[in-house]
Amino acid sequence: MTASCPPPSTSEPSREEQARALCLRLLTARARTRAELHGRLAKRGYPDDVSTAVLDRLAAVGLIDDADFAQQWVQSRRAHAGKSKRALAAELHTKGVDNDVITSVLAGIDAGAERDRAEQLVRSKLRRETLAQDDARVTRRLVGMLARRGYSQNLACEVVLAELAAERERRRV
């Protein structure tokens, strides 16, 4: 004996169901902020009331958490890209994270840790450089590399000059 299956639904899914499906597809690729998802829904033409309802539901079940997103983003970008606090704050702001959340997440990074990370980046690049008598080219490249990662000009120059001197001393031995 076979059980009969109910006939497939011929009605279209509601706008809210479509919006939820879109958000879930986007969230399977990577974590996203509430603002990112809201922007994608708006781009697809979903009304604000539908977007708000869907995003509130996703936040209630824990699929959207801007504070957790910001924490993971900072850890990942500091470890893999060597970004400074200033660059991380700009990236999070672009992603739509609230300023209070950004401030609290970045409060855990002190100036000493920032300097240590800059030194690590410079050391790793210096190992592959050939040092000539004129350090201007190497200095310019290393300071530029740190500047692109958001480090201040002052810190970048200090770190590069100190690490360049240390590398010269190490190679002499």
Curated annotation (Swiss-Prot):
UniProt subcellular location: Cytoplasm
Keyword Cytoplasm (UniProt): yes
Swiss-Prot/TrEMBL keywords: Cytoplasm
Major localisation: cytoplasm
GO BP terms: regulation of DNA repair
GO cellular component annotations of the record: cytoplasm
UniProt superkingdom: Bacteria
Assigned protein family: Belongs to the RecX family.
PANTHER family given in the database record: REGULATORY PROTEIN RECX FAMILY PROTEIN
Role this protein plays: Modulates RecA activity.
Protein name: Regulatory protein RecX
Organism from which the protein derives: Mycobacterium avium (strain 104)
Source species taxonomy: Bacteria, Bacillati, Actinomycetota, Actinomycetes, Mycobacteriales
